[in-house]
């Protein structure tokens, strides 16, 4: 039973530990991601941030427990930190997005409904008019926006973002942040990794400082004011 006035959890990490070849990547990590919140994880390189997200997605084994308290269908959207494209494949932005929006191969054409939905998604992420651009010629920032568009339809209950602003210009970062705020207003929970402390201040409800263990966790403004988080971040990323 959740006490009155307390936002119920969507995801709970309980004593999560991960080791690889006797190296402890995460040690007894416990934290709670509240429903409808923007929860940001910060920490130095090698702190286990991406590892924790990967465990939350069920992609790697771990010790401990990760509990999900879904309100709906439990759909998860995911934008990874890195995404590689085979330059020999003539796949366009529309082809890629159509693969998950219609039940036939794209070689038979893209349905009118799928094409309209794809155009709308691309407008949302600032890629209006790039439907027929090959993925292989897109910049890293543009590829990241394509992945974000793919993660948003249908609206996920949990959106997992691993350094989503990487490779984006100032305008792209602003669009991303506006989109995160809109998603939060729609009831989507956002769990993200960021090295940009100004972005964290603008977006986060709660912050977890991770360095293989939870260093501290709490409301964003209070946590950032109480701890020298910038000292933990990679050089050049302490904005």
Q: Model regions: which residues?
A:
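Conserved beta-strand-loop-alpha-helix hinge in the C-terminal portion
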Residues: 213-236
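A short, surface-exposed alpha-helical micro-motif characterized by mixed small hydrophobic
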Residues: 200-202
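Conserved ABC ATPase "signature" region
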Residues: 112-130
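H-loop/switch region of ABC-family ATPase nucleotide-binding domains
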Residues: 194-195
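Catalytic Walker B motif of ABC-type/P-loop ATPase nucleotide-binding domains
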Residues: 159-163
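Helix N-cap at the start of a conserved alpha-helix in ABC-type nucleotide-binding domains
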Residues: 170-172
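Conserved ABC ATPase signature
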Residues: 134-138
């Amino acid at each position: 039973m959740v006490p009155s006035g307390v936002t119920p959890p969507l995801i709970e990490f309980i004593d999560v530990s991960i080791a690889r070849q006797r190296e402890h990547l995460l040690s007894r990590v416990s934290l709670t991601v509240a429903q409808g919140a923007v929860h940001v994880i910060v920490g130095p390189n090698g702190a286990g941030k991406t590892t924790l997200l990967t465990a939350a997605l069920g992609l790697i084994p771990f010790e401990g427990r990760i509990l999900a308290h879904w309100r709906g269908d439990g759909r998860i959207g995911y934008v990874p930190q890195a995404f590689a494209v085979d330059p020999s494949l003539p796949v366009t932005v529309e082809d890629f997005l159509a693969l998950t929006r219609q039940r036939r191969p794209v070689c038979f054409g893209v349905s009118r409904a799928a094409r309209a939905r794809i155009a709308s998604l691309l407008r949302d992420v600032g890629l209006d008019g790039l439907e027929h651009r090959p993925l292989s010629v897109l910049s890293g920032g543009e590829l990241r926006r394509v992945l974000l568009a793919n993660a948003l339809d249908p609206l996920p209950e949990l959106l997992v973002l691993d350094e989503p602003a990487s490779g984006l210009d100032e305008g792209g970062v602003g669009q991303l942040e506006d989109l995160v705020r809109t998603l939060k207003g729609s009831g989507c929970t956002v769990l993200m990794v960021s090295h940009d402390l100004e972005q964290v201040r603008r977006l986060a409800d709660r912050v977890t400082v991770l360095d293989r263990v939870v260093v501290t966790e709490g409301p964003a403004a209070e946590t950032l004011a109480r701890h020298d988080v910038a000292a933990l971040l990679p050089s050049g990323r302490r904005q």
